[in-house]
């Protein structure tokens, strides 16, 4: 954040009912939102997306699905691809009888940039301004 001259403000919501009031408290005080992959945030994405759109705030999310549901963009894991990778590991254990403790820990092999073009346009962002790091 320092490198890009950004100030962070950390907030949380304990239920979907809290989301609207938390967002109202941020309006006019932040330039954008980052939402990690979280079940509560994912279930509130339609509300978050609509409130952020009204406030013209970009929303960077932790997953493609959250960006599709109201976020602006994400650079992260594609859970479908991760599921296929996990399936291959399970196959090695179940069919090839590999011992899990002998297998290397794996992380997602590829990160994906996803831009919700309709959302970006609605808040005044040109999609060519959004680039992967």
Predicted region positions:
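Short hydrophobic alpha-helices and adjacent helix-cap/hinge residues
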Residues: 1-133
């Amino acid at each position: 954040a320092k490198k890009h001259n950004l100030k962070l403000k950390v907030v949380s919501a304990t239920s979907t009912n809290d989301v609207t009031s938390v967002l109202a408290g941020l309006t006019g005080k932040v330039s954008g939102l980052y939402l990690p992959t979280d079940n509560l945030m994912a279930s509130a994405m339609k509300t978050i997306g609509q409130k952020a759109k009204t406030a013209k705030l970009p929303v960077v999310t932790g997953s493609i699905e959250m960006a599709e549901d109201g976020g602006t963009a994400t650079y992260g894991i594609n859970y479908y691809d991760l599921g296929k990778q996990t399936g291959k590991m399970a196959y090695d254990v179940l069919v090839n009888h590999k011992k899990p403790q002998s297998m290397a820990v794996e992380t997602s092999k590829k990160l994906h940039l996803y831009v919700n073009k309709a959302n970006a346009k609605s808040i005044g962002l040109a999609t060519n301004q959004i680039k992967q790091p």
